Amino acid sequence: MQGVPDLSDYGEDVYDLQFGNGTDHLPTSALIKTEFRRKILYHMCSQEDSNLAALLLKPGPLQAILGAKFDQGSPVDAVPRIFIKTVQDRVITPEQQDAMIEKWPPENVYSVDSDHSPFFSAPFMLLGLLVKATASLPTI
């Protein structure tokens, strides 16, 4: 499915798919299977944080990913954007992040040496970048 992260390096059966509209329709949400989560999502997190994150993780709605649009000139362009790259991300690779930045350019780009979950693996670095980003944006 276009727009869904390619995790084929980890095998063919990485996702638990939910079929909210019945199994004769496309899946409505997905969740990375338990046995892959630490390796893919939380490889830079402590075991304790990885366990906590696993308890909090919920299925992601596929339509939100598949239906995302980046229309130029729409009212949403008036909202300042920043992008924080997660350099060690195994879900959305740095190359994919660069493509996202190019497709819908933000005001500023920051980087954090983190996996897909910087709020667990690098919370203080993430906080510092959020403060820096907030200070750099014009007041509304």
Give the residues covered by each predicted segment.
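Short, basic/glycine-rich phosphate-binding loops at helix/coil junctions
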Residues: 29-35, 80
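Compositionally biased amphipathic helical and low-complexity segments enriched in hydrophobic
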Residues: 8, 127-131
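Short, charged N-terminal helix-start/capping segments
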Residues: 11-21, 47-58
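Conserved serine/cysteine hydrolase catalytic core
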Residues: 48-51, 55-120, 124, 128, ...
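Short glycine-enriched loop/turn motifs at secondary-structure junctions
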Residues: 34-36, 111-112
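Flexible "cap/lid" loop of the alpha/beta hydrolase fold
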Residues: 1-29, 64-65, 98
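Helix-loop "lid/cap" segments that line or gate small-molecule binding pockets
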Residues: 35-44
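Eukaryotic N-terminal low-complexity, Ser/Thr- and Lys/Arg-rich leader segments
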Residues: 22-23, 131, 135-140
